[in-house]
Amino acid sequence: MPLPFRTAAIGSTNPAKVEAVRRILGQLAPACAVEPIDVPSGIGAMPLGEEAVRAGANARARAALERSGADVAFGLEGGAILEAGDAWLTGHVVAVTRDGRLGEAAWGRMLLPHVAAERLRGGEELGDIIDDLFAKKESKRQAGAIGILTEGAMSRTDAFAYLVAMACAPFLHPEMYGASAPANARRRRLGPRRVAHRGSP
């Protein structure tokens, strides 16, 4: 059964993120119009740590919902986890409906090259690092680090599309997840905290 949404907002104008939402809603809500909205993540251009990435996705979704008349809004955020001497790529999607329901999904981790880990620790943004290492331009708006490192086997859009689909599960099966307002109940836990970042569409 298709989702009942007629309008959806996405808290980004990044083409890779916008296409991920359009791809999945094209399957789950074919009549839904998607509006990209440029909103701040509140956690800077290079979120570091799972909590920061999650907070950024949440902030994007809520800001997009507030700035639009959409039935549902999506926040997509990518970032890195620094652990010991390694850096891991990760991502998070938050979806919030006009009536207060919440959907969420997160990536597993992808190990980044050690040279990228060193430069992330030095304060650089991953997109800039990847562009420099592979002689690309604005890769984060296209295939992304995932697409480049996997030689196109999976793009940034592909990875985010999986998360968008999974974040829609509570809306597809409200009887299983509960149709009351979990977004309100969990707002405090999801909201921005003091998270590590270095000050992306």
What residue spans do the PLM features occupy?
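N-terminal polybasic phosphate/anion-binding patch
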Residues: 1-70
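Anionic-ligand binding patches
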Residues: 46-189
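Residues at secondary-structure transition points
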Residues: 17, 81-85, 197-200
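SAM-dependent methyltransferases
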Residues: 1-6, 174-201
